[in-house]
Swiss-Prot record:
Record GO biological process: adaptive immune response; antibacterial innate immune response; antigen processing and presentation of exogenous peptide antigen; antigen processing and presentation of exogenous peptide antigen via MHC class I; defense response to bacterium; defense response to Gram-negative bacterium; defense response to Gram-positive bacterium; dendritic cell antigen processing and presentation
Disordered: region residues: 690-714
Activation and inhibition: Forms arc- and ring-shaped pre-pores on top of the membrane at neutral to slightly acidic pH conditions and converts to pores upon acidification. Undergoes transition from the pre-pore to the pore in a processive clockwise hand-over-hand process. In the pore state, 2 alpha-helical regions refold into transmembrane hairpins (TMH1 and TMH2) in each protomer that form in the ensemble complex giant beta-barrel transmembrane pores.
Pfam families registered for this protein in UniProt: MACPF
Site (Cleavage): residue numbering on this chain: 352-353, 357-360, 628-629
Domain remark from Swiss-Prot or TrEMBL: The MACPF domain includes the central machinery of pore formation: acidification causes a significant structural rearrangement, leading to oligomerization and deployment of the transmembrane beta-strands (named TMH1 and TMH2) that enter the membrane as amphipathic beta-hairpins.
One GO CC annotation: phagocytic vesicle
Subcellular location: Cytoplasmic vesicle membrane
Record-given protein name: Macrophage-expressed gene 1 protein
Primary location group: membrane
Top-level taxonomy: Eukaryota, Metazoa, Chordata, Craniata, Vertebrata
Family note: Belongs to the MPEG1 family.
Function comment: Pore-forming protein involved in both innate and adaptive immunity. Plays a central role in antigen cross-presentation in dendritic cells by forming a pore in antigen-containing compartments, thereby promoting delivery of antigens for cross-presentation. Also involved in innate immune response following bacterial infection; shows antibacterial activity against a wide spectrum of Gram-positive, Gram-negative and acid-fast bacteria.
Length: 714
């Protein structure tokens, strides 16, 4: 009987557990559950990720992806996230084309063409730091070659992102960190965090991808071969196509003799060749086009991408928990960080390889190819410094002009203010102070205290205001920093006979006064300019009138080069075009460019944001740090805490007074209770003593005298 009841009890417990079990276990949600349920592969080519449009690489995920509904493509072949939809290509889209790229300026990416042509930012440098582009440019310039590209493309799906998709958790948290700094008026820290956001999530967000596969052959042939066949570019592209089809064992029905001659001539002028397979099965020598195409299924990749800039997705509807005005400020901060990334990687110069002013490092034309060089005189430079707080920093920041021995320019020259910034250095020192208890028991306590020393430096260089005597200025021998080399020496050093002068925090400018021995190492100098100050040497009118705004560019015949990025400000210098252009292409300059403050300044804790447009107020909960739309009563309470009541008492003062009154009342009540209890105890003791004395006296009076008998015996 007992065993039967035990079995029944266990059965009831199992039944209850099954009844309470949810339809979908939250721990098992995701694409793995969908794969196990539907027995289908997951589509891996998805939009919603960050994209670096300079390097053409995928970055961190911006749009969140979930697989709650186990959606599939319309043809039922792949599992897709809830936030995307696909447009299947109902017909076969096998494309084959052949093209000539006679200049790297007209570069088009194989797998990122659409997003590289997006025009909202500096589109001229889109893709210019990708591996594909840098290989093409280097081979074209070094080998004096042109590029032919033959490709077969098979597009299976177009995958698009839903407009109602939410931002990913990591991206949202990064935005909230920036917002927190903006609320506290910590602009510099917010800029630093925005630059980190660009480093991690790129410049754009992919909104659409073409999923499929592509087989591409890129050849580099001598430019002379194209010139010899100038009237028949079709002949060159046909030769490239035949060479490609021979690789994939595709039979071409043309005249065998002419085909052989074309192919031999083409191959004899080929300096470099590469075949790439994007998607499908890996390419190998002897593979047929048919075999490669059959292997595309389950090997899909992105063969084209489209998208929008990162800040386009920072909108109030994507961040409903933040005030609209704060979201706009956040979006602008991120947009500025993206623009800095583009600006610091834009290298203006002559892009015509046939010009003597050609600049191999340039990625944007600046019309300097035909300009004539004007000789300018360099009047030196100097840097002033003012201590603001802490230890002495100016001894490493001050620099006197070599020509004057002072913080000034020579006669006939005028100073040009390049930049003013604040330099910070942290230091710690032992500080001791006396701590006392009840002003009697005292001891000396010592501890290491971290402090920040600050100094402001102001950098100047000297430009001639008119005609100056020959050999009166300084010779310029390049410059370098602790992170870059001097192109004149290919090292962090100056040429022989040159002296390094300090500028900004880490820049060393090489100069010389020796016109006999130092001249062979000098280069024609065309001035400096920065993010706040232009170059007065750009034209004669500006040079005569220093008070007029100067253009931030180099004079004709000079090319622009980066000197340093000083705490988010780019400083450039100009030398004769065609110089400092050798070597390999410059790598991309990644953010952050702004230095985070060593210690945060006194922050303003914003708790109320009022919009004049919508007449609504947002209140920040001090406990959760979350924003919410404020009700009238909550708004009144918040305003009372911030501004105090009508008598001018602040929230902190009111709280202090209240606490003091409570403590005082507590002390009074405690003393009253103690006094009452003490009084009661004393009264009780007094009553007991009186009773005892009465009993004693009564007993004495009742006892008979000695020798007398009781008159009433029993």
């Amino acid at each position: 009987m007992n065993s039967f009841m035990a079995i029944a009890l266990i059965w009831m417990m199992i039944a209850c557990a099954e009844a309470d079990k949810p339809l979908r276990d939250p721990g098992m949600t995701g694409f793995q559950t969908c794969k196990d349920t539907l027995k289908l592969p997951v589509l891996e080519v998805l939009p919603g990720g960050g994209w670096d449009n300079l390097r053409n690489i995928d970055m961190g995920r911006v749009i969140d992806l979930t697989y709650t509904n186990c959606k599939t493509t319309e043809d039922g072949q792949y599992i897709i996230p809830d936030e995307v939809y696909t447009i299947p290509q109902k017909e076969s889209n096998l494309e084959m084309n052949s093209e000539i790229r006679d200049s790297w300026v007209n570069y088009q990416s194989t797998t990122s063409f659409s997003i590289n042509t997006e025009l909202s930012l500096f589109s001229k440098v889109n893709g210019k730091f990708s591996t594909e582009f840098q290989r093409m440019k280097t081979l074209q310039v070094k080998d004096q070659a042109v590029t032919t590209r033959v490709q077969v493309r098979n597009r299976i799906y177009t995958v698009k992102n839903s407009p109602t998709s939410e931002l990913s958790f990591g991206f949202t948290n990064a935005l909230m960190d920036i917002c927190d700094q903006l609320e506290k008026n910590q602009t510099k820290m917010a800029t630093y965090l925005a630059e980190l956001l660009v480093l991690n999530y790129g410049t754009h967000v992919i909104t659409s991808v073409d999923a499929g596969a592509a087989l591409v052959q890129e050849d580099h042939i001598r430019s002379s071969f194209l010139l010899d066949n100038q009237n028949s570019e079709n002949t060159v592209t046909a030769s490239a196509g035949i060479a490609f089809l021979n690789i994939v064992n595709f039979k071409v029905e043309t005249d065998h003799t002419s085909q052989t001659l074309l192919t031999k001539s083409y191959l004899s002028n080929r300096t470099n060749s590469r075949v790439q397979s994007f998607g499908g099965i890996p390419f190998y020598p002897g593979i047929t086009l048919e075999t490669w195409q059959k292997g595309i299924t389950n090997h899909l990749v992105a063969i084209d991408r489209a998208g929008l800039p990162l800040h386009f997705f920072i909108k109030p509807d994507k961040l409903p928990g933040l005030p609209g005005g704060l979201v706009k400020k956040l979006s602008k901060t991120v947009e500025t960080a993206v623009r800095h990334y583009y600006t610091f990687n834009t290298h203006p110069g002559c892009t015509n390889v046939d010009s003597p002013n050609f600049n191999f490092q340039a990625n944007m034309e600046d019309d300097s190819c035909d300009a004539k060089v004007t000789n300018f005189t360099f009047g030196g430079l100097y840097q002033e410094c003012t201590e603001l707080s802490g230890d002495a920093l100016c001894q490493n920041l001050e620099q006197k002009n070599l020509l004057t021995g002072d913080f000034s320019c020579p006669s006939g020259y005028t100073p040009v203010h390049l930049l003013s910034q604040t330099h910070e250095e942290g230091y710690s020192r032992l500080e001791c102070k006396k701590k006392c208890t009840l002003k009697i028991f005292c001891k000396t306590v010592c501890e290491d205290v971290f402090r920040v020393a600050k100094a402001q430096f102001r950098a100047y260089w000297c430009v001639a205001t008119g005609q100056v005597p020959d050999n009166s200025g300084l010779l310029f021998g390049g410059l370098f920093t602790d992170k870059s080399i001097n192109p004149m020496t290919n090292a962090q050093s100056c040429p022989a006979g040159y002296i390094p002068l300090n500028l900004f925090e880490s820049l060393k400018v090489c100069v010389s006064l020796d016109y006999e021995l130092g001249y062979k190492f000098s280069v024609p100098f065309g001035g400096f300019f920065s993010c706040i100050m232009g170059n007065p040497l750009v034209n004669s009118d500006t040079a005569k009138d220093i008070g007029a705004p100067s253009l931030k560019k180099c004079p004709g015949g000079f090319s622009q080069h980066l000197a340093v990025i000083s705490d988010g400000c780019q400083v450039s210098y100009c030398v004769k075009a065609g110089i400092f252009t050798g070597g390999s292409l410059l790598p991309v300059r990644l953010p952050p460019y702004t230095k985070p403050p060593l210690m945060s300044q006194v922050a303003t804790n914003t708790v109320i944001v009022t919009s004049s447009e919508t007449a609504r107020s947002w209140i920040k909960d001090p406990q959760t740090n979350q924003w919410k739309l404020g009700e009238p009563l909550e708004l009144h309470k918040a305003m009372t805490v911030i501004h105090g009541d009508g008598n001018g008492m602040s929230g902190g003062e009111a709280a202090g007074v209240t606490l003091g009154v409570i403590i005082a009342l507590g002390i009074v009540i405690t003393l009253a209770i103690y006094s009452t209890r003490k009084y009661k105890k004393e009264k009780e003791y007094q009553e007991i003593e009186e009773q005892e004395s009465l009993v004693g006296s009564f007993a004495t009076d009742a006892s008979p005298p000695n020798g007398e008998q009781d008159p009433c015996p029993a």
